[in-house]
């Protein structure tokens, strides 16, 4: 193995080690946040499970397009997290302009930046900042129930040879966990917006779809029961 290739391989290995170490060090208290509109704020806890490493934590909220101008503020936006410690991020709605007949969805971003280590610098270890992005669902105060109240109301229609259109008449944003078309596992699905629709691309050769089987992710971030529906 020549020198340049050895250096490249070493850098890759060190990067993976640093990333795995970080991934095992910082954790969030949930995989999604439901903001109850009847409350003043929502919260998310950041935990540093490492016994040795310190991290700089940066947080912000944006929309699906990455626009940081949103109705929410998150505090603290920047702080140090010592080994084995935790801190609570607080999310506050600053306006009254959000729709009251359906959920709104935004994104919480949490970036953990490893603190500089003299030992790591001496060994030329590449330390990597990793960002976690999770959904923030704003649920208006007058909206009763939860996401599982809408999962069996989804409507499916054929939208050409390689597409299925999914319509969601409910007031809840519904994210698929598993989705099968004619028994075929469809990996790329996504979220059906509240009172909106989503087109799902099917792999070539799927053929005419007569029924789908699916489940969705509930308020706790876990998968619900499977349901079979016909495709019109």
UniProtKB/Swiss-Prot annotation:
GO terms for molecular function: protein folding chaperone. Transmembrane segments: none annotated. One of its GO terms (cellular component) is outer membrane-bounded periplasmic space. Its main location: periplasm. The keyword DNA damage does not apply. Keywords: Chaperone, Fimbrium biogenesis, Immunoglobulin domain, Periplasm, Signal. It is found in: Periplasm. SUPFAM superfamilies: PapD-like, Periplasmic chaperone C-domain. GO terms for biological process: cell wall organization; chaperone-mediated protein folding. Required for the biogenesis of long polar fimbria; binds and interact with LpfA. This is Chaperone protein LpfB.
């Amino acid at each position: 193995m020549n020198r340049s290739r050895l250096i490249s391989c070493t850098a890759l290995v060190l990067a993976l080690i640093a990333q795995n170490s970080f991934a095992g060090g910082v954790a969030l208290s949930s995989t999604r946040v439901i903001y109850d509109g009847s409350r003043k704020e929502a919260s998310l806890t950041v935990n540093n499970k490492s016994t040795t490493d310190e991290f700089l934590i940066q947080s912000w909220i944006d929309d699906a397009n990455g626009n940081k101008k949103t109705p929410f503020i998150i505090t603290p936006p920047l702080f140090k997290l010592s080994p084995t410690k935790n801190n609570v991020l607080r999310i506050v709605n600053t306006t009254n302009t959000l729709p009251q007949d359906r959920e709104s969805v935004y994104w919480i971003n949490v970036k953990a930046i490893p603190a500089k280590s003299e030992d790591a610098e001496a060994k030329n270890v590449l330390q990597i900042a990793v960002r976690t992005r999770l959904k923030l669902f704003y649920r208006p105060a007058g909206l009763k129930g939860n996401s599982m109240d809408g999962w069996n109301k989804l409507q499916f229609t054929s939208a050409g040879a390689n597409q299925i259109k999914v319509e969601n008449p409910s007031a809840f944003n519904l994210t698929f966990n598993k989705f099968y078309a004619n028994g075929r596992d469809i990996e790329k699905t996504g979220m059906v917006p509240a009172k909106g629709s989503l087109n799902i691309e099917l792999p070539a050769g799927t053929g005419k779809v007569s029924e789908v089987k699916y489940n969705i992710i509930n308020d706790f971030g876990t998968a619900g029961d499977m349901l079979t529906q016909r495709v019109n």
